[in-house]
Amino acid sequence: MTQEEVPLPAGAVLRPVGAEQWGVVAWLWQAFRHDLSPVVGGLPYADGRYGAAPLQPFPSPDGTGYLAWRPHPNTGEDAPVGFVLVGGLASDRRTVAAFWIAPPLRRSGLGTALALAVLERHPGPWEIGFQHDNPSAGAFWRRVADAAFGSGGWVETEEPVPGRPHVPPDHFIRSLA
């Protein structure tokens, strides 16, 4: 294991996304958007893929990514089982721009450990957004915020979605330190 790697539950390891691995993130982005589609009403475009424009700012001085890897059960080779995109690195407040864990590994502790490891890698104030109609994400991020920032070390706000007055407001968790 290298200095860049962090061991995670479920036999996984956290690694920064390498230059040659952004294509892997783009494939996982499709799974992320598929999972989110019932919440945001998202549909694939004519080519069968979900929009990936939010990936354009990555990588950059302001944004980076991390992959969770573990041996594939059928082949034993390392396979990606989750990712996190972090924005705001050149700003005063870091953001979780996207977060996804493969469904079979959800509720294994992997997601919480991955989130906490990434938050720890980038000290400073954080902002984590999630959709009002995604109560599982809300419960998850509130637990992570308590673990990362301490009870009372964060606030949650609701804010209108820009340009979409017909949808419920988004929620944002912001650390106080």
Placement of each model-derived feature along the sequence:
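A short beta-loop-alpha structural element at the N-terminal edge
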Residues: 12-27
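Conserved beta-strand in the GNAT
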Residues: 67, 77-88, 95, 100
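Conserved GNAT acetyl-CoA-binding A-motif
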Residues: 121-136
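C-terminal "cap" of GNAT-fold acetyltransferases
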Residues: 132-134, 147-177
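Conserved acetyl-CoA-binding loop-helix of GNAT-fold acetyltransferases
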Residues: 101, 107-120
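Conserved active-site tyrosine of GNAT-family acetyltransferases
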Residues: 141, 145
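Active-site rim helix/loop that mediates acceptor-substrate recognition in acyltransferases
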Residues: 33, 38-74
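Residue-level recognition of the GNAT/N-acetyltransferase active site
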Residues: 97, 102, 106, 131
